[in-house]
């Protein structure tokens, strides 16, 4: 898990004081990264969109007030939700609240964590959520078959799923599953059916032929997943 941490602080603040705050958070996040397997990448507000795109999540570290423009300019280069860690003093929290409010007004999602007791746990949770978001954005899900009357056209459904949920939706004809199931290796299908029967405490129905048919369908689905490089179907 790679996380870009971007520090923002007002140029009117004492440099040594701001540097001391930054070093404190760097040390604390290093401990968190070591315990959770998170790789933190540190940047200043001049970080490019290309550099940010190499990470899975964005953590904006607000070290003082007077950082609204800097923070918003960073978020504008990022495609995804943002976690904002606000120093507990020097108007940093007020700046963080304004940054998030303005970012939300143009479609960005995010949360604020104040740098007080327990903040590392909150940041860890925020990063876990960001990882889930990133995984969903990379996911490809297969949708098999169609109905005579569709509520939404396939292209519209693909767009809605992508926008709201994140994954790319791929529509596949049901006939492809039927063909792959028929072509499934008989020995492999029998092994899977036997495994399912052995794992069951009791079988009333289906019968052996139905179990074998289910195993063939499973092998057909697995072939579709492999050929189309799907994460789910």
Model-derived segments and spans:
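An N-terminal assembly and electron-transfer interface module characteristic of large anaerobic redox
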Residues: 1-232
